[in-house]
């Protein structure tokens, strides 16, 4: 059976990917199984670029001995012209919690009628 290492330490993501691959002969494991993710500065300007940075960093750490899969995701709000987008996890600051990011987003949408609060979650 083939093992694919997911470039994340998020156990929920590993479970989600394993559900997607139920008919596959591959098993998805977290980077934690190999000592965790190396530090990756997400400097890409797109979700695809940041996903590539994560996959490349983990692949290099594993010395290209395993298949590596990565993703990047975020919330795109129409009124905010696609923001927070690639900055969703650090929208309220580099060390911000999920709650702080949500609070900043709610503040940014204050006064906007609910029918105009359109957004999408993008994952690549």
Language-model segment annotations:
Residues 2-5, 11-124:
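Anionic-ligand binding patches
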